[in-house]
Amino acid sequence: MQIVTDPAEMQATADKLRAGRQLIGVVMTMGALHEGHLSLVNLAREHAGTIIMTLFVNPSQFGPGEDFQRYPRPFEKDAAMARSAGVDYLFAPTPEAMYPEGFQTTVSCSGITRRFEGERRPGHFDGVATIVSKLLNITRPHVAVFGEKDAQQLALIRRINRDLDMGVQIVAAPTVRENDGLAVSSRNIYLTGDERQKAPAIHRAIQHAGEMLAAGENDLKAVAAEVAGMITENTQFKLEYAAFVDEESFEPAETVVKEHEYRLLIAAAAERVRLIDNQKFRV
């Protein structure tokens, strides 16, 4: 595995790979790697022969009071995990390299981002859209793999890829879960012991939503309300939202239309970390 820190060098390397007819797959991370990230690498390998992993804690997607300074950065461990997973190039630039003096451009997508995470984290998705656009331009991939756990982010990336004619195949990877159902996340280390015990209640509530829909419930607002009640009752987390959206448009959905796909989105705040989860349903 080759470690690259200079954007120009990474871009030149990617251009050479493309000239040699190598299919490039990219997996973007902020480090603190876990099994979820490794599953993205495995999926990327099914679509491409050369895998680039980006490792960059992006300051522009963190808001005031968020965890940019304390976000874990175990670089040596991450590099070892990437190497063991079969990553060919680890692109790990500095903030100064990605946002040099005089940098002025922001990529913004107003529709998909105006609710849910976008409403609660102002500026977050502008930071995501900007850095993803830059990293796609630098790594020149044919395929980019992103996890479904960050569903709104995935919808945003699909939209900017489409709107800006980037021509990258965006592949969605299923959420990886712990044995008790908790979605794997680098930030789970912030949970206290008691919070960690109660956190799987979120996934149980999602499963209950699936049971309600399978039994013929058509009122998505009622299903979401029951999900919210289960989470509030079984945890001390502050529920921020539990809502269904149309899978294609990401607009809020209230009533089932048969043979249609919806996604249940959930966010709940523990003492030091926000937990997000989601699930797609076809009804």
UniProtKB/Swiss-Prot annotation:
CDD domains referenced in this protein's UniProt entry, alphabetically: PanC
Binding residues for (R)-pantoate: 61, 153
Binding residue positions for ATP: 30-37, 147-150, 176, 184-187
EC class of the enzyme, as a word: ligase
EC number: 6.3.2.1
Self-association and partners: Homodimer.
Protein task: Catalyzes the condensation of pantoate with beta-alanine in an ATP-dependent reaction via a pantoyl-adenylate intermediate.
Name by which UniProt lists this protein: Pantothenate synthetase
Source species of the chain: Chlorobium luteolum (strain DSM 273 / BCRC 81028 / 2530) (Pelodictyon luteolum)
